[in-house]
């Protein structure tokens, strides 16, 4: 927002405007309060479908692949991220984003419900919304679909 000339186009994936967002179901949020999923791979495998939706609900190979790649984060860093989500919001200045913006979101995203993508698209001028039939981790579960579409948007 401060230097729009530095950004020709913007792509926002599986995100919200911050604290003013429509939250996921409380049972999902309860699983996110702790960094346990980053520390306990069996726990991650058990909750991945509920937490991330999409292919994580139906494809055990995707769940295993994700659980094996996840890096442990520091508790401090994790809680700072939660704090940022709780107190920071971009809602009041989204209208100042002037460059063409592609908003990509999964229709089955339990963490950040799709209504949040619709809010972003309604508040950002020149925004295009691509609501996909997938979950929160579509960049990992569907890279062969997502990457070319993003490339096409950026090349326009």
What residue spans do the PLM features occupy?
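Residue-level signal for the nucleotide or nucleotide-sugar donor/cofactor binding architecture
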Residues: 73, 112, 141
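Conserved alpha/beta-hydrolase catalytic His-Asp/Glu region
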Residues: 21, 41-93
